[in-house]
Curated annotation (Swiss-Prot):
NCBIfam families: L18_bact. Belongs to the universal ribosomal protein uL18 family. GO terms for molecular function: 5S rRNA binding; structural constituent of ribosome. The keyword Acetylation does not apply. One of its GO terms (biological process) is translation. This is Large ribosomal subunit protein uL18. This is one of the proteins that bind and probably mediate the attachment of the 5S RNA into the large ribosomal subunit, where it forms part of the central protuberance.
Length: 122
């Protein structure tokens, strides 16, 4: 009997394949996105050293206070603008976008477009 793999297993497998080709450097770090059922998380990572340079999530008090819900497209767009502003304050203007195996639609797309509008290049 052939068993069907879960969505999470398929997503993790896609992410591992992508990570073989994506790597963040000091000049162009990686913007990694993670989406759970209730929240979204974004980190800007320098993979050569293994350090997180900037991070933000919908759990942050200043972001959460402005939102009705933390798991919709509006929350993702707000997170994109916040992560872009934090990155620009640290002197990071270009990044490599790592969608984490998630489909580039909905919340992930909203976060990416908001980050681009706020000044990040990718």
């Amino acid at each position: 009997m052939v068993s069907k793999k879960s969505r999470t297993e398929v997503r993790v497998k896609k992410h591992n394949r992508m990570r073989n080709h994506l790597a963040g450097t000091a000049q162009r770090p990686r913007l990694a996105v993670f989406r759970s059922n209730n929240h979204m998380y974004a980190q800007i990572i320098d993979d050569t050293v293994g350090n997180t340079l900037v991070s933000a999530s919908t759990l942050d008090k200043d972001i959460k206070a402005e939102l009705e819900k933390t798991n919709n497209v509006d929350a993702a767009a707000k997170l994109g603008t916040v992560i872009a502003k934090k990155a620009l304050d640290k002197g990071i203007s270009t990044v490599v976008f790592d969608r984490g195996g998630f489909i580039y639609a909905g919340k992930v797309k909203a976060l990416a477009e908001a980050a681009r509008e706020a000044g990040l290049d990718f």
